[in-house]
Each structure stands twice: as C-alpha cells, then as structure tokens.
C-alpha cells in the first residue's frame, strides 16, 4: 500500500538477471521513441499494470526482439548497415492504464508494429476488467490489420479476444512465453515470411530474406500474394527488419489504389 507514484517504473526482482538489461532498454526506448519514430522505427505497445507480471514478460520480450534484430543485421551488406539495422529494432513501450495506452497508440499508430495487452487494468482511475477488450476493440476500429495479442489469467477472456480479432494467451499456462514468442513471430513480421494459401492457410512459400523475396516475387501464387499485400504483411515484414524506406513506400501502394497484381510484383521487385 505504499505510494510509489514518485518513481518512473517499479519492478519486482524474480531472479532473472535479464531484467536489469530490460530496465535499461525500456528507459532508453521511452527516451528515444519520439526521435526514432521519425526515422521509421516501429513501436511494440505493452499494456500491463501488474508489477510482477511486466517484470517477468519484459525480459522475455526484449530477449526475443534483440535476438531477431541480431539475425536481421547479418543480412546487411557492411558493418555500418549492420549497426543501423540493430539500432532500428522495434521499441518496446509500457503503458499501465487505458488512458496512457490510448495516448501512445493515437500518437504513434502509423508506427505500431503490434499491441500486447492485459484485459484488466486501470481506466479513469479504477481497475476495469474490460479495459483491455475496449482498448483492443478501439484499436481494431482504427486499423483492421495491426497485430493484437490479449493476455489474461482468466481463460474465458479468450472469447473477447476473438471478438476483436486478437490472439489470446493464458497467463496461467506453463507455456505462456512459448505462445507469446510464437504469436509475435507469426504476427509481427519477425522470422521468415511465410506465404499462405488464403483458403486453406497452408504454406505455399517461405522466404528468409530480402534476396529471397526479390528472387521469388514473380513466382508467388496470385491469391497468396494478394492476401498478404491487402493486409500490409509485406510492409510489416520489412519494418521488422529496419528496412524503413522500402517499407514506407510499399505501405502506401495498396491493393485498393492499384488493383493490378502484376504491377504490384514489379513495384516490389524494383523497390528492393
């Protein structure tokens, strides 16, 4: 019941030494967010008010993002570009109330790589068990395709996640962090680009890097390419690799504006 309002963040030591690095990175990300977003860097928004839980999830989240950034950096042509790739990793920002989360999303919505939110947290000064659902629903109305993940200790909240087209993670699950990494890898544009058949969702192609995309862009099935283009998946995949100029360019070449799949193939090829 102590008043902790004088502190920027309060953490709970759970024995994971990675927490120390996470604290440093979290403060760095908050301080650099305004500047880096101007250069195209993306934001991962974490909404969680439980000190114990965000002290546990942040080390896992940072470890995963940093590992992915190191892998992407190896695709760079020289040491300078490798450093730029590392610096361009997504920034992780923590919000602990509805108002704080909505303010961050509203300001940086065009640079939001994805949102991970609890279901129960403060709204208008009071704990609200539906705050997460209302937040994710509001974000979904703003952006039809931004990846959303709802996490809760109440398994029945999975129905609410489905209503706002978000993935659901059970906080009580022993494999919670395995599920979290799986969803982030699949939804946020990390890892290989897996092209899928929109009807069966079966894998039709797997591309590991930019060269693979350029080499195979004219061979990808029309329906699969259209599915991913219409959901900004290509742009998101490039963003996660800190390829901001290409990503920003392709983000504005939408299917609704062009409606020519062969022209899209050529534009992607030329942009790379």
Predicted features and spans:
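Terminal, compositionally biased segments used for targeting/anchoring and flexible tails
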Residues: 156-272
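Conserved acidic segment of CheY-like receiver
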Residues: 40-52, 57-82, 92-94
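Receiver (REC) domain switch/output surface
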Residues: 4-9, 13-33, 60, 163, ...
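Acidic, metal-coordinating helix/loop segments flanking the phosphotransfer/catalytic sites
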Residues: 72-114, 124
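Acidic catalytic/metal-coordinating carboxylates
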Residues: 97, 125-134
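Short acidic, S/G/P-rich loop/turn micro-motifs used as interaction or catalytic elements
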Residues: 17, 50-54, 99-100, 119-126, ...
